[in-house]
Amino acid sequence: MAAANAPITMKEVLTLPSIGINQQFITFTNVTMESDKYICVRETSPQNSVVIIDMNMPMQPLRRPITADSALMNPNSKILALKAQVPGTTQDHLQIFNIEAKAKLKSHQMPEQVVFWKWITPKMLGLVTQNSVYHWSIEGDSEPVKMFDRTANLANNQIINYKCSPNEKWLVLIGIAPGSPERQQLVKGNMQLFSVDQQRSQALEAHAASFAQFKVPGNENPSILISFASKSFNAGQITSKLHVIELGAQPGKPSFTKKQADLFFPPDFADDFPVAMQVSHKFNLIYVITKLGLLFVYDLETASAIYRNRISPDPIFLTSEASSVGGFYAINRRGQVLLATVNEATIIPFISGQLNNLELAVNLAKRGNLPGAENLVVQRFQELFAQTKYKEAAELAAESPQGILRTPDTVAKFQSVPVQAGQTPPLLQYFGTLLTRGKLNSYESLELSRLVVNQNKKNLLENWLAEDKLECSEELGDLVKTVDNDLALKIYIKARATPKVVAAFAERREFDKILIYSKQVGYTPDYLFLLQTILRTDPQGAVNFALMMSQMEGGSPVDYNTITDLFLQRNLIREATSFLLDVLKPNLPEHAFLQTKVLEINLVTFPNVADAVLANGMFTHYDRPRIAQLCEKAGLYIQSLKHYSELPDIKRVIVNTHAIEPQALVEFFGTLSSEWAMECMKDLLLVNLRGNLQIIVQACKEYCEQLGVDACIKLFEQFKSYEGLYFFLGSYLSMSEDPEIHFKYIEAAAKTGQIKEVERVTRESNFYDAEKTKNFLMEAKLPDARPLINVCDRFSFVPDLTHYLYTNNMLRYIEGYVQKVNPGNAPLVVGQLLDDECPEDFIKGLILSVRSLLPVEPLVEECEKRNRLRLLTQFLEHLVSEGSQDVHVHNALGKIIIDSNNNPEHFLTTNPYYDSKVVGKYCEKRDPTLAVVAYRRGQCDEELINVTNKNSLFKLQARYVVERMDGDLWDKVLDENNDYRRQLIDQVVSTALPESKSPEQVSAAVKAFMTADLPHELIELLEKIVLQNSAFSGNFNLQNLLILTAIKADPSRVMDYINRLDNFDGPAVGEVAVEAQLYEEAFAIFKKFNLNVQAVNVLLDNVRSIERAVEFAFRVEEDSVWSQVAKAQLREGLVSDAIESFIRADDATHFLEVIRVSEDTDVYDDLVKYLLMVRQKVKEPKVDSELIYAYAKIDRLGEIEEFILMPNVANLQHVGDRLYDEALYEAAKIIYAFISNWGKLAVTLVKLQQFQGAVDAARKANSAKTWKEVCFACVDAEEFRLAQICGLNIIIQVDDLEEVSEYYQNRGCFNELISLMESGLGLERAHMGIFTELGVLYARYRYEKLMEHIKLFSTRLNIPKLIRACDEQQHWQELTYLYIQYDEFDNAATTVMNHSPEAWEHMQFKDIVAKVANVELYYKAVHFYLQEHPDIINDLLNVLALRLDHTRVVDIMRKAGHLRLIKPYMIAVQSNNVSAVNEALNEIYVEEEDYDRLRESIDLHDSFDQIGLAQKIEKHELVEMRRVAAYIYKKAGRWKQSIALSKKDNMYKDCMETASQSGEHELAEQLLVYFIEQGKKECFATCLFVCYDLIRPDVALELAWINNMMDFAFPYLLQFIREYSGKVDELIKDKLEAQKEVKAKEQEEKDVISQQNMYAQMLPLALPAPPMPGMGGGGGYGPPPQMGGMPGMPPMPPYGMPPMGGY
């Protein structure tokens, strides 16, 4: 059966490898699919992650780095459950995350391991442990709750599924276990069914199970069913069963009958078993899926088998329900995600036709609303109706698939049934059944409502509408409107009867709802009429309605102007204003007229409203001049100002300041140009200067930047308004830096008497012209001098101020200024007063009044300049007596004492406050010795040096310098550029230093001589101090200095100094001597001070005499000395001597260097002695390691074994590696064996050719690297047995397999390699790489085993790699097989066709070519078969029929000249009605003269050149062929050609049929004439009947009468009269029935009460009885008897002839 006609369709939705899932992770433990929404894959390499695949977007997987043992996505939402084992325990940690919210919902640590888990509901996880089953809700904080313990039959089972029933009352756990010993290949299935209510379990044998709900007829509540499938082996027989059982039967209700059916497995699938079961709740079908990919489909209700097929070539390990489509998803080992769904178009025909199960077909069609059972349903309905089973017929009609029986005919059929007294009318049963099943259609709703309305049962209608049981229509609304307007409105709305809805809203005065509803449905009512209607009764409602219209999309349907006029016509000014203000808010240019209108009407009637509108500024497009005039008339002057645009108008209005708010007027000035604003201001000042000054000032303040400050100032000056100027500039002053502005403000303030403001500005402002302001204030002669004081004090006009105040006798202000304002300027005031010859008493009083606030220095300077210093004596003495320490006070006082020569030395030496430089400078010309005293007191070095040099006072200078002990001063006086240096040195050496008793002074002097680089002078100085028995003879530092200076300046004296001096720093001086290369002197110093190490270092490092050093070492016998000697010997390469010296020194500190040098010189015997000594002192890994290495180098292996057994800290691993690297394999073997480094030991044994031991060591090491090294060594040594042992441990690692294979192959060991790989197949850890590599080896070296290997292990091969190998080795048959296994059907087909002798096999090729994706390969296959296998080409074409372009196939065969060859194929595909196929077959039929098949082809398939074919065969020698030509002309509507051709062959029946079908009166009447002419009277009579509808009675009678054929026309005449009289009778009958209906209505009203009792049995609500039609029988006329044939004429069928009544 073709796949397209199969009842179940399969589709590959996705392949997991295509979205990056590695093949190794496509397993039961790594992949989960809890619903049709998500697939979850757990990856462990290259890093741990979880991949979530949303089935709505499968090509956009979500990958998250998560480490877990299992991951489950929630069936409904993005909630992920994770399970991971707690390290070091058997416990599992469970977590639940919300991926979208990125939050953890819950977590729990299970005390035992969870072996299986599953989402059993969207809110509940089922957890299965080794012994129990738990449920864990994701809601709240609850922990897992134990549900039941596992039964014994599930012990040691692998749990593969766990499910719960829809009501969560039943649970089922399924596991599988190894098969019985008699048949181990067949896996056992075990099931545990648990009842939550009864808390009981039942153990059963089953591989798969699923729950379902099913409604048993007669039971309102659904029953819970369980379906399970099992396959068991008993007594040598395999039994496969499907069971369907009800769980928890409901007492007193009909129960489900237990069903069971056989599962038929093909022989090739004897060991296959069910792995999953899904129940389609949409179609009530059971899907049983087996491991090897078989699908069984059964009906849930009857357990009837429907379909079986293999849906996957690879094992299926996971399924999930696809609830939305009534199918399921399945995932196989290859990673295909397959979707199985019901083929809705074919399943019913398949069940009814192929299975011949009509009842199941009907039930499934009703259940799933599926097509294909229409005829069966209609036939069944008619049978039930004929059997008067009206209830069953009603139920069948209600459940009919796709509503095929829900028609007016069915309603009429039930209406026509007579009602027996006391019984429920069938029509009521029908409607009741429909209501219980769902919703009525429009016709049914109308008919039922008509009954209800007639009986005034409005409440029934309301209930049905509320339950959505009726389909609303306009007709239904019209019917209901007669009894209830509200209900009718609801019906109109549901039926979208828009005009009726609008009319209803209008009647209810709900106009706002009209707009809302019209917008929703896109309807346009008569808005103007509605608005006028509302205006008459509700003006505010009209405003609201108009506003709602204005907000409609696309604008208001009624023009705003029209709406406004409607309001104004009724004098509704406020309403019109309200409307316009709302709609004109956008302020659009096109609304200018309306803006003007709303302002005009309000300026005339409600000026305050207009003022508010204008103030808001919401309009800008109205007629401004018109509105300006109206505003002026209404007294809205400020608005008129804003609207006028001409200066005269503005000037006229602006003077009305009494009626204009000042602030508004100020703001208006801001809208004018500066020129116009000035003009208006001038007018205002002219009209009322005093009254308008404040407004003008305010305007100037506000807009000074626009108007210009200068212009404003000129304006006020023009009107001489200093008050205005003062107020204007007062606000602007803080922003201006213009000196002129500040001056004018000072001037205006002064002239307006604002003295305090003048004082403030002169004090605070920084921008006025000081000179100009000073002059103005002096000229103004203000009574208050403070402004002038501010100016003069700030800008240093103090002398001018003093002169002004003194000359104007304002002495009080002078005292105030000096005492309070600025005492610091008192010296200037005093100087000016002295210049003005002011009395000294006033000046002294002024000075004494200020006292300590007075700055002394400038005061002294002012008095000194005028030779009036003595004036200050009293003032200065007063300050001193007050305790003043001011230097200037004491300087001045000192100068006065020096000038008066009043014991100046006492003052200079005792006064601590004067400035030595100032006073000393003052004394230099008067007395240099006083200057020296002053300078010495202040340590004024430079000044003192200068004055002593100038006056040759060198002794004073030398003493000062020595006492000073200042390095910089010494540097200066000892500088070679100092002309007086020699005189100073002489005085220092002869006088100053011998007099000194201070070591610090001596030290400073010596240091200064050293710094000045005067060594000879220094030696001279030091010899005098140190060697001539002075106080400093034994001074340690000076002795050091003397020797060091001699070393530097005169080395010949050094040895003498060493012998004569004893108190010097021997080590330091010795080092200096070494640096100065005075080695013997240094050696003497170190010996003198017993510094033997330094002494021997001088001999070794400087004298470079190892012999003298050894001799010295023997003399002193110190370890440290021997150590230095040993190090020197080591440096010189005397390794043995050095080692001996180190041993004498007992020195182990330099063992690293000794080891290095000993190894470089190969002195291992001595090194052993040294290391043994070192080991006694230090515990270093390096020492022990080097000792082992030294033993190995001198071949003392016994000592090595003894040493490593003793306690040691050697790094044995490092030593072993070093020995191995240097090929000391025996020693390395000892080390590696001791530390159990089996890997290194194995490699070492390989080097020693001890292969068996190497293998044993490698086994202990169990390292891939070690195995490889040993294996390769064994291969090289041809120890293939040992090599195979190693190789089996390597090839289980995927990454190392290829390396081993290449190593064997490069050395030609092909058989041994194959043997190794074959042995590897049986390994527990055998992987895909081994199977693949063996296949490649077979392909290269043992071709005969290749195919067997591929077939055995096709699922475990890396097929692409093996494909390349087979292609290289040209194994075409195997290559084809591999392509098929890898679903590379295009390549498989190409290979077969290119290498057909080896690769072609017909059945296989058919399977391949049916699955190829490249369309061109279909036609290549056709060419291939045409050339090589033409005898079976039709078999191939039938396989490809659904994929081929039939036209192209026909062209190929036509060009090849073998069109007849594919005749069977063309017949099979002719149903597609392809032109090329039709023409080719017709051509063949013509050639074969098979006119029957030709006519059949023409009838069934019209796509061909009809006229061309007719013209081709109209002259054929066979009559039947010519008849076909006439038939084609008839079909093509060429009636005349068809009739002419039939006439020619005397085919009169064909002529009549053609004329009848043409529908043309003329042709029919011409044919009558032809028969008359030919004398064919019988044909004439027959033609009258055949063309009855076309022949006019008068023409027929005329022809018959004229040609004496009335007898032959009489049957036609009788029929015509009967038909005519029947029409008349029908008209009379209609009139009588109309009269009866009037009487019947009257009778119905009387029968209402009696008929109401008929509603008792109606479900769910009662229905009124329909009016009973009259019982009418047939018309009394039977069908006409068939006319007997006339002689020589065939029987005449009644073409177009109506049935004749019997007479």
UniProtKB/Swiss-Prot annotation:
GO biological process: endocytosis; intracellular protein transport; vesicle-mediated transport
Observed effect of gene inactivation: Defective in bulk endocytosis as well as in internalization of prominent plasma membrane proteins. Defects in constitutive endocytic recycling of PIN auxin transporters and their polar distribution in embryos and roots leading to altered auxin distribution patterns and associated auxin transport-related phenotypes. Defective in embryonic and postembryonic development.
Stretch list, region Trimerization: 1564-1703
Localization terms from the record: Cytoplasmic vesicle membrane; Membrane, Coated pit
Binding site for the uncoating ATPase, involved in lattice disassembly: region residues: 462-478
UniProt cross-references to PROSITE patterns, sorted A to Z: CHCR
Region annotation WD40-like repeat 7: where it falls in the sequence: 315-343
Entry GO MF terms: clathrin light chain binding; identical protein binding; mRNA binding; structural molecule activity
Domain notes per entry: The C-terminal third of the heavy chains forms the hub of the triskelion. This region contains the trimerization domain and the light-chain binding domain involved in the assembly of the clathrin lattice.
Function according to Swiss-Prot or TrEMBL: Clathrin is the major protein of the polyhedral coat of coated pits and vesicles. Mediates endocytosis and is required for a correct polar distribution of PIN auxin transporters.
Quaternary structure annotation from Swiss-Prot or TrEMBL: Clathrin triskelions, composed of 3 heavy chains and 3 light chains, are the basic subunits of the clathrin coat. Interacts with CLC2 and TPLATE. Interacts with EDR4.
Family per similarity comment: Belongs to the clathrin heavy chain family.
Name of the featured protein: Clathrin heavy chain 2
